[in-house]
């Protein structure tokens, strides 16, 4: 049987996680309303492939991420936003 190596690995130092603040909860975003007709705002929360970006990527709080997801889905139904990207 082969002996296991006696050298122990040091655990990698943990990188500090940058927490992004919700844009809509901040002072300058208080007067912003999430609406399905505001496609310019909603496009910032959609990836190039047409998927809704995750909360950990956008930095939104739970409630505003839900509101964005609902608004994007409504805009897709009304054909203001595409369901998927046109490029392959």
From Swiss-Prot:
One term under GO cellular component: cytosolic small ribosomal subunit
Pfam families from the UniProt entry: Ribosomal_S18
InterPro entries: Ribosomal_bS18, Ribosomal_bS18_CS, Ribosomal_bS18_sf
GO molecular function (one): structural constituent of ribosome
Xref: PROSITE patterns: RIBOSOMAL_S18 (PS00057)
Function of the molecule: Binds as a heterodimer with protein bS6 to the central domain of the 16S rRNA, where it helps stabilize the platform of the 30S subunit.
Subunit organization: Part of the 30S ribosomal subunit. Forms a tight heterodimer with protein bS6.
PANTHER family for this protein: 30S RIBOSOMAL PROTEIN S18, SMALL RIBOSOMAL SUBUNIT PROTEIN BS18A
Family (UniProt): Belongs to the bacterial ribosomal protein bS18 family.
This protein's name: Small ribosomal subunit protein bS18A
Lineage of producing organism: Bacteria, Bacillati, Actinomycetota, Actinomycetes, Mycobacteriales
């Amino acid at each position: 049987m082969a002996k296991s190596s006696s050298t122990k690995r040091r655990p990698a130092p943990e990188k500090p996680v940058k927490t992004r603040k919700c844009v809509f909860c901040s002072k300058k975003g208080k007067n912003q309303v999430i609406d399905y007709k505001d496609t310019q705002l909603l496009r910032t929360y959609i990836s190039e492939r047409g998927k809704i970006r995750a909360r950990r990527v956008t930095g939104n709080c739970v409630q505003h991420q839900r509101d964005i997801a609902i608004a994007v889905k409504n805009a897709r139904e009304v054909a203001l936003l595409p369901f998927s990207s046109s490029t392959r």
